[in-house]
Design a protein with these regions (language model features):
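Generic solvent-exposed, charged/amphipathic alpha-helical segments
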Residues: 17, 210-214, 255, 259
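A broad structural signal for alpha-helix termini and local helix breaks/kinks
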Residues: 142, 217-218, 245, 262
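Glycine-rich beta-alpha junction loops
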Residues: 36-38, 126-127, 151-158, 190-198, ...
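Oxyanion-binding "anion nests"
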Residues: 189-235, 240
Length: 286
């Protein structure tokens, strides 16, 4: 399969390539796409060197699949151009997610909604996917009425420049003396917002979790109350979730469902200090 990765030299694009390799995805030809300053660079994938190409060259090559992680404006401009030449696009940006003509998909939840003619498929926000994958089997069993969620999101969610900011701060850099992507220092600090605030008082990140949950679960009646927080962790988002169900349940059954859910690893033995932590979840696919 001929695969293009748009944003291949970025933090998420690099991780995409790692996962493709880990899962032995059938890539016969790789088209790493990046901005003009990176064109011509060499990257290694599955033991071979590949040359970074322009989007125009990648489109001309008519790949079978294009994975996008280069920001919303890039997706808005380039995804239709890939689709026009017969390339199926999976977009990691927020641009297409709430477009009523596009499917917003978590394969384990609603992969069956994808049809042959769906050439641009939206990938949900990272915090939404992380929340909904374990909640889907619980929703099917008990019908979720309300979700109250707080997220503790790594600086990696902002990219390389955020990691550089935290590294500079940990090295003793003084505020204003190093490039910063956050409005305040992040080391030894937390930022009580991710993305900008809206008139409602929620942030854009929080509203993504609300709107995307409704679209993926195909149920606008579910109450979603999110608080998203940036924490000084380099790799691995965490979430605390409180659920209200329509139907009766037992904790034993909830644990059993979690244990049986593909993609979920249950760590729930607080008496022995066993619980999920980003340090140990980083780099894992569950």
């Amino acid at each position: 399969m001929k695969v293009a990765v748009v944003g291949a030299t970025g933090l998420v694009g690099t991780r995409m390539l790692e996962v493709l390799a880990e899962r032995n995805f059938p890539v016969t030809e790789l088209l790493p796409v990046a901005s003009a300053k990176s064109v011509g660079r060499k990257i290694t994938f599955q033991g071979k060197e590949w040359t970074v190409v322009s989007a125009e060259d990648a489109i001309a090559a008519r790949p079978d699949l294009a994975l996008f992680s280069a920001g919303g404006s890039t997706s808005a401009e380039l995804a239709p151009k890939f689709a026009e030449v017969g390339t199926r696009v999976v977009d990691n940006s927020s641009h297409w997610r709430m477009d009523p003509t596009k499917k917003l998909v978590v394969p384990e939840i609603n992969g069956d909604v994808i049809e042959k003619d769906d050439m641009i498929i939206a990938n949900p926000n990272c915090s939404t996917i992380q929340m909904l994958l374990p909640l889907w089997p619980l929703h099917k069993a008990y019908t979720i009425k309300r979700i109250v969620v707080s997220t503790y999101q790594s600086v990696t969610g902002t990219g390389y420049k955020a990691m550089d900011q935290m590294t500079a701060e940990r090295a003793g850099g003084k505020w204003g003396e190093y490039p910063a992507v956050y409005p305040h220092p992040i080391d030894q600090n937390i930022l009580p917002h991710i993305d900008s605030f809206l008139e409602t008082g929620y942030t854009k990140e929080e509203m993504k979790m609300v709107n995307e949950t409704h679209k993926i679960f195909a149920d606008d009646s579910i109450g979603v109350s999110p608080t998203t927080v940036r924490v000084p962790v380099q790799g691995g988002h965490s979430e605390s979730i409180n659920l209200e169900f329509e139907k009766d349940f037992t904790l034993e059954d909830v644990r059993r469902i979690m244990e049986e859910t593909p993609g979920v690893t249950l760590q729930d033995d607080p008496a022995n200090n066993v619980y999920p932590m980003p340090l140990y979840a980083w780099g894992k696919n569950d």
